[in-house]
Amino acid sequence: MKTTKSKKLYKQALKLMPGGVNSPVRAFKAVGGNPLFIAKAKGSKIYDVDGNEYIDYVLSWGPLILGHAYPSVVKALKKAIEKGTSYGAPTELEIKLATLVKKAFPSIEKLRFVNSGTEATMSAIRVARGFTKRNKVIKFEGCYHGHVDGLLVSAGSGGATFSIPDSLGVPQSYTSETIVLPFNDINTFKNTLKEHWKDIACVIVEPVVGNMGCILPKDEFLKVLRNETQKYGIVLIFDEVMTGFRVSFGGAQQYYGVKPDLTCLGKVIGGGLPVGAYGGKKEIMALVAPDGGVYQAGTLSGNPIAMTAGIETLKVLSKASVYKRLEKTMQYLEEGLKDSAKQAGINVKFYRAGTMFCTYFTENEVIDAKTAKTSDTEKFKQFFLGMLQKGVYIAPSQFEAGFISLAHSEKDIEKTVQAAYKIFKKL
């Protein structure tokens, strides 16, 4: 497989952009080698500038649940762009997309569109603080909620700690209001709320942790979060930027039967264009300007191009047959990868929620960030590079989720499973 043009472009990019990329994981630092530069994409495939074809399980990090360049989305975008790219004024398109989102997520009574998942989580926390008149935030180790200063933190020693910054340029004063707890640890969570509840404005969580692979909530974890936050008057925020429309049409909250106070969305609702949204109970959202005193704004928020792509995507997803088809494809991939690993005699743990998944190279059950980190990242590196050579593109990090789309065919899955078996045997 030749990647001459990609290598040449990467050298040029390194002179212009930090690491040659505009988001760190794209640089392939966790797996070695040079990143691929993509020329085009269609359906389940991406094509690099050297003409190589890959079955894509990254799908722009989740948004493209219909596949690349889905015909009805492309058609709608062509019409929309001829009318103008942005108006900086309200449009009917915002109402249409908001209505579709509300239909899928009954817990969202009012919502506000923004331009990214980071903006959504940042804004939701601001509103929660305004509503409760408290300052502290609980998040969980391994959960990523965008590059918000106050949430770029890591836990210190012990179960519950007041956090230190996880990035240069973030003052400790910004993160001193953030408490990091282990995911799936019910007792530590209960004890922390019992001790600090008077100071805690909100609890924010990825209901399925997609930024440490794919860590599922165990037992009654999400229900405990709901019950305990209600008891102490704390706002519960579900960060469904990744799980929204991925785990099910109504996201993780529908799948697990737990309704948060606020929900953050992104990725799928933009159909591949930049978008985010946050929303929830009317009495909380009533604080958002211009109705209330919590300020939040955006030049391109609700722009007609992103709204159009989102509307067309959700229209397709609202059809009853779509999730049945996605589930069938996902089951086929899951069974194939598990069988391949077993036949090859390699220990892996496969987890999935709806159409997002991860294969961990470990013998341990993965229930939190600590157990996720027992994965053999060197084996994953070899697996990634081997799959790439065989025309299968997975996330270039052990700790990122993979995704399927409506465009993935049985033939795609069969090729993927066959490639995985051959690579597993070499590990």
From Swiss-Prot:
Q: In which pathway does it act?
A: Porphyrin-containing compound metabolism; protoporphyrin-IX biosynthesis; 5-aminolevulinate from L-glutamyl-tRNA(Glu): step 2/2
Any Pfam family matching the protein:
Aminotran_3
Keywords recorded for this protein, A-Z? Cytoplasm, Isomerase, Porphyrin biosynthesis, Pyridoxal phosphate
GO cellular component, alphabetical, reads: cytoplasm
* Gene Ontology molecular function: glutamate-1-semialdehyde 2,1-aminomutase activity; pyridoxal phosphate binding; transaminase activity
Q: Which residues carry this modification: N6-(pyridoxal phosphate)lysine?
A: K267
Enzyme Commission no:
5.4.3.8
Q: Which domain of life is it from?
A: Bacteria
Q: Where primarily located?
A: cytoplasm
Q: Is tRNA processing among this UniProt entry's keywords?
A: no
Q: Which cofactor does it need?
A: pyridoxal 5'-phosphate
Subunit composition? Homodimer.
The molecule here is called Glutamate-1-semialdehyde 2,1-aminomutase
